[in-house]
Amino acid sequence: RRRNLLKGAAIAAGAMSAPMIAKAQSGPINMRWQSTWPAKDIFHEYALDYAKKVNDMTGGDLKIEVLPAGSVVPAFGLLEAVSKGTLDGGHGVLGYHYGKQNALALWNSGPAFGMDANMILAWHKYGGGAELLSKLYASIGSNVQSFLYGPMATQPLGWFKKPITKTADFKGLKFRTNGLAIDLFTAMGAAVNALPGGEIVPAMDRGLLDGAEFNNASSDRLLGFPDVSKVCMLQSYHQSAETFEIMFNKTKYDALPAKLKAIIAGATEAASADM
């Protein structure tokens, strides 16, 4: 009888160990991401920081590698690449999708009254913003799962060859901006070119732009704005608040275990708190 008990225990132990062996053989889930930021931009550092949070919190069960803008696709091509599965995910801002669905820019360059960045994030999470964003993505057939984080303050008006002193100074001015601000400055008479961050300073250096705004003084300095312009005009109404976007290919996100999805959400909140 004792031999039968030992035999039964051995069979049970073997059965219990089978799933553990299968899990060990499957290994970690690896994801390749790209940001919309140049490698030297502090925003790419934020993208790397988010990936590290997820990698550490999952204990290596999910490993995210983040490449800088242009490594796989141009910065403005991130949404399509993630939707199609060319990339597993990405880090950027909703305003960069303006050409696909201009309402997406409401989260980043909306009217200069009402909500600041923290209020936008609160509305997005608790007031129906996330559901609206999902509907907008569905309207253009985008297969993505989006998370917003990281409140950012009002942006500078931009860098210019000479000071802007009146509205008329924008007439005929070759200017870089993005999102709904494209329509705003176009209506003011500017010739607007919506370039990604890494292309702005070279364009100003070649005289293709008379002025440009990107985001903040730290990023602008790292990208070389002071090398091509000595006039920086602070504060503006064109982009009073902005947030980052974390984006997954939805098919791949939906296939993740519930535990990893919870960690992704927690890492997003932690990254937002850091800012």
Where are these regions (language model features)?
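N-terminal secretory/targeting leader peptides
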Residues: 3-120, 132-275
